[in-house]
Every structure is written in structure tokens, then in C-alpha cells.
Curated annotation (Swiss-Prot):
It comes from Methylobacillus flagellatus (strain ATCC 51484 / DSM 6875 / VKM B-1610 / KT). Binds 1 FMN per subunit. The gene is pyrD. FMN binds at A62, G63, L64, D65, K66, T86, N139, N172, K217, T245, G268, G297, Y318, S319. InterPro entries: Aldolase_TIM, DHO_dehydrogenase, Dihydroorotate_DH_1_2, Dihydroorotate_DH_2, Dihydroorotate_DH_cat, Dihydroorotate_DH_CS. This is Dihydroorotate dehydrogenase (quinone). The lineage of its organism: Bacteria, Pseudomonadati, Pseudomonadota, Betaproteobacteria, Nitrosomonadales. Pfam families: DHO_dh. PROSITE patterns: DHODEHASE_1, DHODEHASE_2. It catalyses: (S)-dihydroorotate + a quinone = orotate + a quinol. Monomer. Belongs to the dihydroorotate dehydrogenase family. Type 2 subfamily. Substrate binds at K66, N111, R112, F113, G114, F115, N172, N177, N246, T247.
Length: 337
């Protein structure tokens, strides 16, 4: 109810400014205790995925809280799990502003943030200070100036750093806003990366006395052969999960709209069908070998249900929150039960 009142005012602001304003005020509400008055979503059936017990299947996708600065506030909205990041070894400013654009006629968002973040050490200080005891995923990436030939070093650095703090780790090789990042999805490069990460995961599990699952986040702009290759590599290297999908470079569904030709990744409702198709394809190739977390274009409980029917075990939201607000979590929980 409250979000529907403030949304018209927020939409008058620059999209990134509205994003930051909302998070800062949500944090103020949490610190004042007023967020405790927000009604919790209905009870959902718990899910066990990647060996983790998720209190409900609705998660927050990476990108909203890049530095883990708002975990406690976001937890008050009833998510079954929260994913923070994408984080890189060193701080970086990301791409020049403006870099986030709404397409309200299509309920879409375009962003070209470029992994703007304060670096992995700042994120870990924020995580250490949180009161949150729920399921926390940490999404890791490479710095923009790290060449792909050395990308594995950035991912391993972040994996070692976040391992003691995360319930699961997501490897982001699918953002369209870091030059050549998606080339890491190609068969040879991906095989080398997965092999190195899997080896390090076992070393860290022995070192810390606990196993932290690793998931791979992939793009929606893949053909059937590419999806098949990725699925085969995930199974070969015994990865724990896959998140489908990131944002799309396609514009065919919004090409006539203002801002549609802005560079960056498109998310929200225009991504829905493309994302679901990748989930269905992955599900066919994986045949239950590892779980899928579905994300992309979820703006209702019915949208989430379609992801589950396509083969996802859990779902995540981000752009849907821009248009629906926190009631979206409640809607999905009621639909999925």
C-alpha cells in the first residue's frame, strides 16, 4: 500500500537516484523499528535446494544491494533468501551516469551499471555487522580492467574471501555491462573457470569445515547449442546450481519505446519469456542433475509459477520490485504456497 502511494513520486526521479533513495529510507525504517510493522508474507512451504533449507522460494536477485549495506532492511520484506553483489576484488565506480533507465510502458528497466561496488573487503565488513541469520548468497565478478585471460584470478580471490560468510556463492559471467565478460560463457573458457573454482571449493571446504555451494549465473542471449554446452560443463564439473538468467541485450520487444536504445541490459517484463525459455532448455539438458534458480521478468505470482513449471526450484526478483514494490513477495508466496 505504502509503495503504491510513493511510486509516482519516485518515478519522477532519475531511476538510480530513486533506487538509492528507496534503499536508504528502507534502512531508516528498519533501524527505527517501524519496518517490523510491515506484514510478513504468508507461510510458504520450505524448499531444500543445494543442500540449503530456504524458508520460502522467493529471493532477492543480486544487483539491488551491491555492497551488502542494506541486508537487515531488505530482510524485513520477507524474502526467503537474499543475494548481494556483484562484488569484485577491488573497488570500481562502474560506468558513467546516467546508467539506469525505466521503460514504464513495458514494465522494463535498462541498466549499464558495470559492477559498480566498493570492493569485496567493504562488503564483508557490512556482512559481519548484519543481524540477518537467513540464507545469504554472495555474487562475485571480475574487475573491468582484468583481462579475461586472468579472470579466474579475480573469481578465485573473491571466492576465498566470501566463502566463510556465504550460504552459497554465485559466479557472474553474464553481465552485458563489463566488456567481453560474456566471452567467459564460451565452452573452453568456461570449462577452465569451472574447473578452477571447483578445485578451490574443495580446498576451502576442507579448510573451513563446511561446504558452500557454488552456482553459475548465465545470460538469456544463448542459443540451444550454447545452453547444451553450459549444461554439460556444469554437470561435468559438478557445480551445485545455475541461475537463469541475467539481463538481455535484445530490444525487439521494446524497440519503439523511449530509452529502448540505451546501451545496457534489459530486465523486467520484456525479459520474461526469453528467461523462461532458457530455464526450460536448461531443465531439459540437466534432467535434474542440479537445481535452477529462475529470475527475469517476474512481476506476479503467475510469472513465478511459470518459472517453476519450466524447471526452476527457486525464483528471484529485482526489476519487479521497481513496478510492484514489496507486495510482489507476498503475491509470489501466495501463488507458490
Amino acid at each position: 500500500m505504502l509503495y503504491s502511494i510513493v511510486k509516482p513520486w519516485l518515478f519522477r526521479l532519475d531511476a538510480e537516484r530513486a533506487h538509492d533513495f528507496t534503499l536508504k529510507n528502507l534502512k531508516r525504517l528498519e533501524r527505527s523499528g517501524l519496518l517490523n510493522l510491515y506484514p510478513r508474507p504468508p507461510k510458504c512451504k520450505q524448499r531444500q535446494v543445494m543442500g540449503i533449507n530456504f524458508p520460502n522460494p522467493v529471493g532477492l536477485a543480486a544487483g539491488l544491494d551491491k555492497n551488502g549495506a542494506y541486508i537487515d532492511a531488505l530482510a524485513g520484506l520477507g524474502f526467503g533468501f537474499i543475494e548481494i553483489g556483484t562484488i569484485t576484488p577491488r573497488p570500481q565506480p562502474g560506468n558513467p551516469k546516467p546508467r539506469m533507465f525505466r521503460l514504464p510502458e513495458a514494465q522494463g528497466v535498462i541498466n549499464r551499471f558495470g559492477f559498480n561496488n566498493l570492493g569485496v573487503d567493504v562488503l564483508l565488513r557490512n556482512v559481519a555487522a548484519t543481524k540477518y541469520k537467513g540464507v545469504l548468497g554472495i555474487n562475485i565478478g571480475k574487475n573491468f580492467d582484468t583481462p579475461n585471460e586472468r579472470a579466474v584470478d579475480d573469481y578465485l580471490h573473491c571466492l576465498r574471501k566470501v566463502y566463510p560468510y556465504a550460504h552459497y556463492v554465485t559466479v557472474n559471467i553474464s553481465s552485458p555491462n563489463t566488456k567481453n565478460l560474456r566471452a567467459l560463457q564460451e565452452k573452453e573458457a568456461l570449462g577452465q573457470l569451472l574447473h578452477a573454482l571447483k578445485q578451490e571449493q574443495q580446498v576451502l571446504a576442507d579448510q573451513h569445515g563446511r561446504y558452500v555451494p557454488i552456482a553459475l549465473k548465465i545470460a538469456p542471449d544463448l542459443d540451444e547449442g550454447q545452453v547444451a554446452d553450459i549444461a554439460a560443463l556444469l554437470m561435468k564439473h559438478q557445480f551445485d546450481g545455475v541461475i537463469a538468467t541475467n539481463t538481455t541485450l535484445a530490444r525487439d520487444m521494446v524497440q519503439a519505446l523511449p530509452c529502448a536504445q540505451e546501451a545496457g541490459g534489459l530486465s523486467g517484463a520484456p525479459l520474461r519469456d526469453r528467461s523462461t525459455a532458457v530455464i526450460q532448455s536448461l531443465s531439459n539438458h540437466l534432467a535434474g542433475a542440479l537445481p535452477i534458480i529462475g529470475v527475469g521478468g517476474i512481476l506476479s505470482g503467475e510469472d513465478a509459477e511459470q518459472k517453476i513449471k519450466a524447471g526452476a526450484s527457486l525464483v528471484q526478483v529485482y526489476s519487479g520490485l521497481v513496478y510492484r514494490g514489496p507486495v510482489l513477495v507476498d503475491d509470489i508466496c501466495r501463488t507458490l504456497g
